[in-house]
């Protein structure tokens, strides 16, 4: 039986389109609101859900996601709380893939074996751990693969031909190409260079290649979808949520809708672009 991730990409290929991968922070602005956002994303057009694990020192993240993590931590969100939200999401949705994205420290503190067992039990499909290089695969990557969790690796504009095979060696699910050197949400990618980079990665792997960092609009999503298997959007969704909060950072009646409205625009852009990889 194919994994949820594999089935999602296969379904998108059958529909001649790329997938939309959305990122939101677990616990932002509070656990219950983040769960409501998570539940609403598939209906708005999200194909794969990245759910951020809040951490006090998110070195790869820009101001928007850093602030989201701090709001989540202030609201009391934890690794255990994040897994509980995934478990509750799974009670009503058994088909949409959920990928946890974050840093190794909270997982290590929780306990690797305990974390992997609890993640599988909750219904997590994969992990993106941005600060674990391939040289440390024995720490988490290989144990995760052994539990049936996809371990999704990042490739960047500075990942050269010598480095790329090591990055891809134990990658599963899909490859996440970071289209901009630096932190999230701070610039707009050069779409021509992105297509060239995706083509280069595809020469080394049959895994789907998704592209993120700097995607803010439906037009951006459409431009990237033309040359990639998927488009990732995170900071723009976090910003949409923040703009909907009141002056004290509390959610309003339209907070979930503020996120899903943008997701619908992004999904329309992705779907308008046609297939990202020839069948």
Curated annotation (Swiss-Prot):
Keyword entries, A-Z: Amino-acid biosynthesis, Aromatic amino acid biosynthesis, Lyase, Tryptophan biosynthesis
A GO CC annotation given for this chain: cytosol
Pathway field: Amino-acid biosynthesis; L-tryptophan biosynthesis; L-tryptophan from chorismate: step 5/5
Molecular function terms, GO-annotated: tryptophan synthase activity
Active-site residues (renumbered): 50, 61
Top-level lineage group: Bacteria
Top EC class of this enzyme: lyase
EC nos: 4.2.1.20
Catalytic activity annotation: (1S,2R)-1-C-(indol-3-yl)glycerol 3-phosphate + L-serine = D-glyceraldehyde 3-phosphate + L-tryptophan + H2O
Family assignment from sequence similarity: Belongs to the TrpA family.
Record text on subunit structure and interactions: Tetramer of two alpha and two beta chains.
Role according to the record: The alpha subunit is responsible for the aldol cleavage of indoleglycerol phosphate to indole and glyceraldehyde 3-phosphate.
Protein name in UniProt: Tryptophan synthase alpha chain
Protein species of origin: Methylobacterium radiotolerans (strain ATCC 27329 / DSM 1819 / JCM 2831 / NBRC 15690 / NCIMB 10815 / 0-1)
Gene that specifies this protein: trpA
